[in-house]
């Protein structure tokens, strides 16, 4: 379940029977150990930085900008992942995952990272008519169908955009309260049934309830 070398959507035969931890696919539990900020693996592993790679690139660009001029004002927009350092707040539309031409809300931010995640631009239908996308639940290996879009605002001292990027993806499978116990961030979530929720200090609002 994924993409081929031409970046077109493909499924291997019987993919549903071979994906996810419940079907015997390897998980991190027995493959790694955490020692503070050090990750130790017990064998060869493949690391996919797709969940935070674009955000990390934004942070690297910001680091160079800051090194060149510490008081520089800027907005780095990597298409859904932004890092903002401005004197006045900028307004950001929360894109409707069902219709990219419309917004479901707005946010305002002047300092920090603001990242969104949604399968609206990466989805396809298999031969059996199943709707598939790239945001998978590691437990069963199939696309998450309960969440339509997420937005995260974060202002940690370093790697703000990488963190916000990863958290926006993690919200598809992990409750916000569980993530907020480990990371400082604000978020908004739009579910598949068009229900909207947001954390108390999220810097924006939805047009619907």
What are the functions of these language-model segments?
Residues 1-209:
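Mature catalytic core of soluble alpha/beta enzymes
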